[in-house]
């Protein structure tokens, strides 16, 4: 759990006296950290009683070839680059914008696996 409310400290270092305590809607969840492996997802309740599918592990990605508009379900081999964090490459974490190696070549992830529960990618030329 991660509290995302306003800080008690001001920029100057002084202390604010909050009018209220911490509220449930100010609390966020830990990141999903989607790894490469046998498909596993988790259903999470969100604001308004809606649900989100969090992909914990993923083995396949829907890769689209923009040249001919064809989409294929292909196996993910490993993570090659990740602009979000260099450590994610070592840990093989799948995030939006990560470049992955697949059976048909390199692809960039366009979806958010921790939010959407699915991996959509675009084939790189």
Curated annotation (Swiss-Prot):
InterPro entries: Ribosomal_eS8, Ribosomal_protein_eS8_arc, Ribosomal_Se8/biogenesis_NSA2. It comes from the Archaea. Keywords: Ribonucleoprotein, Ribosomal protein. GO terms for molecular function: structural constituent of ribosome. GO terms for cellular component: ribonucleoprotein complex; ribosome. Pfam families: Ribosomal_S8e. Residues 1-20 are annotated as: Disordered. The keyword Ribonucleoprotein applies. GO terms for biological process: translation. Part of the 30S ribosomal subunit. PANTHER family: 40S RIBOSOMAL PROTEIN S8 (PTHR10394). HAMAP family: Ribosomal_eS8. Belongs to the eukaryotic ribosomal protein eS8 family. This is Small ribosomal subunit protein eS8.
